[in-house]
Each structure stands twice: as structure tokens, then as C-alpha cells.
Curated annotation (Swiss-Prot):
Assigned protein family: Belongs to the universal ribosomal protein uL13 family.
Gene Ontology annotations of biological process type: negative regulation of translation; translation
Annotated GO CC locations: cytosolic large ribosomal subunit
Record's protein name: Large ribosomal subunit protein uL13
Purpose: This protein is one of the early assembly proteins of the 50S ribosomal subunit, although it is not seen to bind rRNA by itself. It is important during the early stages of 50S assembly.
Domain of life: Bacteria
Keywords for the protein's UniProt record, in alphabetical order: Ribonucleoprotein, Ribosomal protein
One family name in Pfam for this protein: Ribosomal_L13
Assembly mode: Part of the 50S ribosomal subunit.
PROSITE patterns assigned: RIBOSOMAL_L13
Gene that produces this protein: rplM
GO molecular function, one term: mRNA binding
Cysteine pairings via disulfide bonds: none
Provenance organism: Hamiltonella defensa subsp. Acyrthosiphon pisum (strain 5AT)
Length: 142
């Protein structure tokens, strides 16, 4: 009996809608990364993108435990000498709440072309509306 290997042409992908309201950031991000990779499917193959599309709404209502709301710091670099910038979790939620979830999930995906393809299937929105009604996403309770 041969080991089954998924082919990228035959992988069936579904669209799921996830509500981030009241969810803990890390616990939500791990489940999103797992589903983007396709590890929840029996036909999971490490070198093939077998994951589903995920739409996350209410990104601004995500929660963190402890004092991370004030203490957690996100760093980025402009590319210029001495151009390191830092933003706290509170500031990030106020300005770009979708980036908080995107950064957390991106760090949990593989680095390289396959990881970037998986990351592109994640759609995060502030508020309860999204632009993917035509895909008829199924509600996913995490």
C-alpha cells in the first residue's frame, strides 16, 4: 500500500468565517495557522498547500491575557539606519486591529513560498462586515 500524497490540483478548499470577538489572540492564531496549513484534514501533506480559506471578523475585539495590552510591543524597521519603530498592542489595536492577528498567524506558518501561499488565504477584517459573501463561508466556532 502506497502512502497518499495530495496534489495541489485536487485539493478541495472551503471558506470559513471566524468571529474573533472575545477570543484570546494566541489561542485563536494557533487554530487559524493549523487550518491554513491543512493539518485538520486527513489528506494533509507537508509540502502541499492543503489548507482552507479563513475570514476573520471583529479583529478589534480580540483579547490578550495579563498586562500584554499595555506591555506587548511590536517592532518594525523602516530600512534606514536607526529606523527601528515600536508600537504597543493598544496602539496597534486602535490603528490597525487586523495586523495584530495577521502578525501572530504569519509567525506560526512556514517561512518560504509555501508559507506565503498559505498566508494569502487569511482575510482579516475590522468590524462585522467582509467582502466574501459570494464564497458562502461556513461559520467556524473556535
Amino acid at each position: 500500500m502506497k502512502t497518499f500524497t495530495a496534489k495541489k490540483e485536487t485539493v478541495e478548499r472551503d471558506w470559513y468565517l471566524v468571529n474573533a470577538d472575545g477570543k484570546t489572540l494566541g489561542r485563536l492564531a494557533t487554530e487559524l495557522a493549523r487550518r491554513l496549513r491543512g493539518k485538520h484534514k486527513p489528506e494533509y501533506t507537508p509540502h502541499v498547500d492543503t489548507g482552507d480559506y479563513l475570514i476573520v471578523i471583529n479583529a478589534e475585539k480580540i483579547s490578550v491575557t495579563g498586562k500584554k495590552r499595555k506591555d506587548k510591543i511590536y517592532y518594525r524597521h523602516t530600512g534606514y539606519v536607526g529606523g527601528i519603530k515600536q508600537t504597543t498592542f493598544e496602539e496597534m489595536i486602535a490603528r490597525h486591529p487586523e495586523r495584530v492577528i495577521e502578525i501572530a498567524v504569519k509567525g506560526m506558518l512556514p517561512k518560504g513560498p509555501l508559507g506565503r501561499a498559505m498566508y494569502r488565504k487569511l482575510k482579516v477584517y475590522k468590524g462585522a462586515t467582509h467582502h466574501h459573501i459570494a464564497q458562502q463561508p461556513k461559520v467556524l466556532n473556535i
